[in-house]
């Protein structure tokens, strides 16, 4: 920088609203958002989730209504997560392979009613297992990698056949991206994208999500043998490199705000779209601060989402998607 004060006044371009907009380095729009939605059985059902104030589980007909709302707000994609009734949960999570399971019903309904909306689907077994883990467990309670990966391939094909646009494996099994990509190609699902949860950390911020899908009370122990250690950053780059080499189109970092440094490093190291998941605990924490009078919801929502974009994200999965889109649309 050659100039100095007073010739250089950095406040000069901040002095008016139009100038601040003109010089903004980062732009946030509704097109940057993905809206996570929880699906439950029934008709005309809305079930508020106590640990996620303002978020509900919706029956399939109501999911379609949310899809129309997303379209009208300019949100390009919704993400689906099923609440599986306890009687449908098994040790092996076989309900994940049912072509008429809740996830597949919701996919078909959305693609029939709102075909212009992208549908992202979660690939993992935790919504379907009686033990709450993302994969199959052995007699010692260890989540086994390779047999789980085979099950995930079948789950991904089931969702793709129903019409899913983006398959998003969140399980963190080694090698599953390559297996899923090979299977999708073999079944002529050439345009089905894979968004890999490449850097998914074993985090304390997932609690409300587990309430939402009904797995919190089922889980024994933790997921530290397959999700990443929150002390590690270099390992995240290895995970991303592995998933890209196996055929992932985009990658995700999860959670979001506590891992902005990982987002920056991934974006700098790889010229691919990077997404973040502003997870349930982050959402609940923000809502709790608003309820305590510690800040303005609108300002906090937009500032946190802008932080993801500034760090290098192409988009953000956030439970605030509809609210943020309304703010951004004026």
Predicted region positions:
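A broad, low-specificity signal marking well-ordered, structured residues that form hydrophobic/aromatic
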Residues: 22, 35
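Exposed beta-strand/loop interface patches that mediate assembly or binding
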Residues: 6-12
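Alpha/beta enzyme core
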Residues: 2-5, 16, 28-34, 40-330
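Acidic, Ser/Thr/Pro-rich intrinsically disordered transcriptional activation regions
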Residues: 11, 18-19
